[in-house]
Amino acid sequence: MNKLGLVGLALLLTGCATPPPKDPENLCNIFKENRSWYKAAKNTEQKWGVPVHVPMAMMYQESSFRHNARPPMRYFLGFIPYGRASTAYGYAQAKTMTWDDYVRENNRSWARRSNFADAHDFMGWFIYKSHQVNGVSKWDAYGQYLNYHEGWGGYRNKSYNAKPWLIQVSRRVDDRSKRYAAQYRQCQKDLDRSWLWRLFFG
């Protein structure tokens, strides 16, 4: 494929990408706007035993639900770019090395960090592993986010104690997770209705 074709393909894929939800503060509205996201979240719940609201609260913090989110570019002398702070990318802000571990361990070579379902499954896997490795409850958004940010070894070594800002961010993630959980209880029955029921009864 020539360069023009590659540019065209990139523009097409960008145009097809799902925009961030209009109301990211409300989990019910997020899933009502993007029914496929709810299906992906339920698949993660069934596969990894992870409650719907925890990875969604973490994803809000990581990318604000932007498919192509990246850390900001760093500049030398204020104008010479010299790379980004990390290889984090996509909905889950998964770093390349950790993503590659996930892909290899789960035989998902087709998975993409810019795909919501893949990124959500990655988060479910990471939360599951954090529970296995460090004994952190899958429902504990605070502890799970610390694992997610610091890695399993960093969490065991309590590296977060030297980062007061990270503890504050993790508390915000936990607060959001609790709000999302309360909202989800109000709309789960409606979201779980079959497509046929929604077709006839709205």
Feature map (PLM): residue ranges:
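Sec-dependent bacterial lipoprotein signal peptides
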Residues: 1-16
